[in-house]
């Protein structure tokens, strides 16, 4: 969960609010005036649906008017905030992505960037022969820390790893190893909006409810003081 201000919560509760996005690429900030479209896909589960034992990546499709050269495989940091009637909330991180492909329109020179989050950095074989292989079996907590370091990301402090061990991985990729560790905990690894590696377990999901709720805020719909059931 993101820590948000009272203003953000107030704006979110108003169905008339708007969402504003910005992107920071190579030190340059792109606001709504430069961004034509933005789409992020992916989440807690793989495309096949509800599952555990995954290391799930998100994808970004961003179309913008470039302010200058954009480096290949450059980093894109997305942010969002809520606005309404001259009021604006704080900017919240909305993902960190790395450019995979680009396409420029011949006439408008608009640039469409496609990228993935840092999870794709885990596609490399885990054991690097130039580094100390460590002792096996290895504690899963140690394994996660080492893989995160190889990926160049931090481990989210909310990640809780049980005192299990992982066997020698042979030629498994880091992503496959993360999937094995995630399965042992009944969850999936993801990259958070802040760019950290997080083990999200089914135990961390919100409690199921049969209340009829508002699509925007998730609040229960009341008839007088009675909550409606579905």
Task: Annotate each predicted stretch with a short phrase.
Residues 176-188, 196-197, 201-203:
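Internal metal/ion-chelating core segments
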Residues 151-160, 184-196:
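Short, well-structured beta-strand/strand-turn elements
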